[in-house]
Amino acid sequence: MEYVYAALILNEADEEINEDNLTDVLDAAGVDVEESRVKALVAALEDVDIEEAVDQAAAAPVPASGGAAAPAEGDADEADEADEEAEEEAADDGGDDDDDEDDEASGEGLGELFG
């Protein structure tokens, strides 16, 4: 990420983004410079208008974090059917005590790990 920041600094200072300038900025910041990464970044940014890219990134809409999206109509029916099947299976297994023993046995391994 330091390499991208160095390129942004050069762009902001109206300096050419080339291998020498990028290396100088990274050296000044105390970064252990890898020449291959410098060359790759300079080549990748060759035809990029950084100002335009920054403006587009800043103007991109940020999705609201209101939880998961509601499923589509067809997906909701399938989800309801899956829930009903899971409930039926749980009800059918209600009298089976072997599952409790399996659950306890699997939990013992975790106790040993964190014990």
UniProtKB/Swiss-Prot annotation:
Superkingdom of origin: Archaea
Question: What keywords does the record list, in alphabetical order?
Answer: Ribonucleoprotein, Ribosomal protein
Q: Which GO terms describe its molecular function?
A: structural constituent of ribosome
Q: Where is the composition biased (Acidic residues)?
A: 74-106
* Biased composition range(s): Low complexity: 56-73
Q: Which GO terms describe its biological process?
A: translational elongation
What Gene Ontology terms describe where this protein resides (cellular component)? ribonucleoprotein complex; ribosome
InterPro entries per the record? P1/P2_N_sf, Ribosomal_P1/P2, Ribosomal_P1_arc
- Region (Disordered) residue spans: 56-115
Its biological purpose is as follows: Forms part of the ribosomal stalk, playing a central role in the interaction of the ribosome with GTP-bound translation factors.
Summarize subunit and interaction data from the UniProt record for this chain: Part of the 50S ribosomal subunit. Homodimer, it forms part of the ribosomal stalk which helps the ribosome interact with GTP-bound translation factors. Forms a heptameric uL10/P0(P1)2(P1)2(P1)2 complex, where uL10/P0 forms an elongated spine to which the P1 dimers bind in a sequential fashion.
Q: Which family does it belong to?
A: Belongs to the eukaryotic ribosomal protein P1/P2 family.
UniProt-recorded name of the protein: Large ribosomal subunit protein P1
Native organism? Haloarcula marismortui (strain ATCC 43049 / DSM 3752 / JCM 8966 / VKM B-1809)
Per UniProt, what is the name of the gene that codes for the protein in this document? rpl12
